[in-house]
Design a protein with these regions (language model features):
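Conserved catalytic cores of phosphodiester-cleaving nucleases, focusing on short active-site segments
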Residues: 92, 103-111
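Active-site beta-strand termini and strand-to-loop segments that position acidic
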Residues: 94-100
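A short acidic/basic microdomain associated with nuclease active sites
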Residues: 71-93
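Short, well-ordered loop/turn elements at secondary-structure boundaries
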Residues: 87-90, 101-102, 182-183
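Metal-dependent nuclease catalytic core centered on acidic motifs
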Residues: 2-78, 110-238
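An acidic- and aromatic-residue-enriched active-site/binding cleft used to recognize and process polar
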Residues: 85-88, 97, 110-112, 229
Length: 238
């Protein structure tokens, strides 16, 4: 059990705890408790936002595993999820015992995000307490003199948001193309639909565009899923 007396954010999460085998229900009950740990202080919030230590794997692999399995398997206790740390060609194992014979699925995760821009927004959020999710970013200064990050206050119209959603998801898919995986591998792309899907009416248009882009890519996976941070969006791309 997590010791709330620990103040160093690097101690809030261990590899042993993160890779524990859980049912989808157990995993989805555990994930919010981890987020709560990092709400204890501004230091802890910054540690999570900048994906330090094991937070990177938690945000980019374990949380998406929870989102994916909740929607696919619900409360089934015949499915076991096991995050895997390391440099192998998968980030998690799913053992599906619902049929006559257990099936093991290897899942590779990736995130649809502009990584450098996202990091800069998190720096501004940590420094100022808020950051425009849509504004253009400019950086001045150097590593030695200190850099200054400015985010303008502009927004994005509906067409810009939907086109950007297609762009970042397609970019994430492209990053996994032309690599050998196999028929027992799934690919899951997580993106923040809370930001990039302005209207539910846009969902199918974005999905259609992403599906079309996928057809042009050589992806060696049995199934490809797109999962949203909201917990409400799950697409299987055909």
């Amino acid at each position: 059990m997590f010791d709330c007396s620990m103040k160093d954010p690097s101690t809030f999460l261990s590899g042993e705890e993160m890779t524990k085998r859980r049912t989808p229900c157990e995993l989805n009950n555990w994930v919010p408790t981890v987020f709560n740990r990092y709400r204890e202080s501004n230091e802890a919030k910054a540690y999570l936002r900048l994906k330090k230590g094991l937070c990177k794997q938690f945000l980019e692999e374990v949380w998406p595993l929870a989102l994916l399995t909740k929607q696919l398997f619900g409360d089934s206790d015949q499915v076991i999820c096991e995050p895997v740390l390391g440099n192998q060609k998968y980030d998690a194992l799913i053992e599906d015992r619902r049929g006559d014979a257990p099936i093991q699925i290897k899942v590779e995760f990736t995130i649809a995000v502009d990584g450098y821009d996202d990091h800069l927004r998190m720096e501004v959020l940590n420094d100022k307490g808020s950051a425009n999710a849509y504004g253009d970013i400019s950086v001045s200064g150097t590593k030695h003199t200190g850099h200054k990050i400015d985010i303008d206050r502009s927004g994005r119209d509906r067409d810009e948001l939907t086109s950007n959603a297609v762009r970042v998801v397609t970019k994430a898919l492209r990053g996994k193309a032309n690599r050998p995986y196999g028929l027992n591998h799934w690919l899951c792309v997580k993106f923040d639909d809370r930001i990039w899907v302005p209207n539910k009416d846009d969902t199918e248009a974005i999905r259609a565009s992403v599906s079309s882009a996928k057809q042009a890519l050589n992806l060696d996976f049995a199934k490809v899923f797109i999962v949203g941070s909201s917990g409400d969006l799950l697409w299987e791309l055909t």
